[in-house]
Amino acid sequence: MLGGMQDSAEAVDLSKEAWRVFVYGGCVSRDTVAFADPQAYSLVKYVARNSLLSVGTDARIQLPELVLPSAFQKKMVDLDASGELLQELRKMRGVDVILWDLNIERSGVWQFDDGSIATNSAELRRVEGMGSVLENARFIAFGSEEHYSRWCTAATMFVAILKELELKERLLVLAPEWAAKDIQGAKNKRVAGESIEFYNHVFSTYLAHLENLGVAIVRLADTVSDPDHKWGSAPFHYEKGLYNRLDEEIRSFARKKNPFDR
């Protein structure tokens, strides 16, 4: 759960040539930045595979030693387990844009006996010994009444804290619909047993709550995926044109805060 943060935030130097971007979420935001003009953005921080429900809890004592194939994977699982997203954001008050997409929420979360939460990421499940640990945890599925209710409460607190930090107006949610088909017309496969339509419908209810909180959201419909995407075929791995559209939306949003192009 989220909690108040009392210490003063650090400011980031604004004397830069590219839009300084903090990415919180998944591949939609990260790929948009990665596929853009390399001079357009400076990625100051990338927080991946962290559900909003884990923020403010500390599940590290519940987990075995985190041995993973890459340092990045270990860092992300450790940050998720520590629940310290807000501490990272407090260092970023000078960023131009905070990009957020909700894709990781699809995985659901695990709650332990002490109330702490860990995101049900593929990386978490890959940790040796995690299977037996999760046998004693309770799974909260994406789209369930409990997940939605708790997520909305967490989102309300999260946005309120961003407002206190003067970051709410720099928050932009990227929300293209998952693609039902790829550019060749082939239907995309179900994800974790659920249809693309299921995910688009459920995500829309979460996004509606953010809209009610006054959060800026970029919604794109009629999307198509690219089976030759750098990270493989998936309904959220889009064709290049969609990333160009998102790039334009980000630049337009950023210029409202800093009225000059870079």
Write out the residue ranges for each language-model feature.
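Basic, amphipathic N-terminal segments that precede the first structured/catalytic domain
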Residues: 2-97, 255-257, 261-262
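A basic- and aromatic-enriched beta-loop-alpha substructure that forms the phosphate/nucleotide-
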Residues: 65-140
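Surface-exposed cleft-lining segments at the edges of enzyme active sites
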Residues: 72-73, 107, 128-156, 185-195
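Well-ordered, non-membrane alpha-helical segments in soluble/globular domains
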Residues: 82-84, 144-160, 192-207, 240-244
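Acidic carboxylate-rich catalytic motifs and surrounding loops in phosphoryl-/glycosyl-chemistry enzymes
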Residues: 173-177, 213-231, 235, 261-262
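Substrate-gating cap/lid alpha-helix
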Residues: 181-219
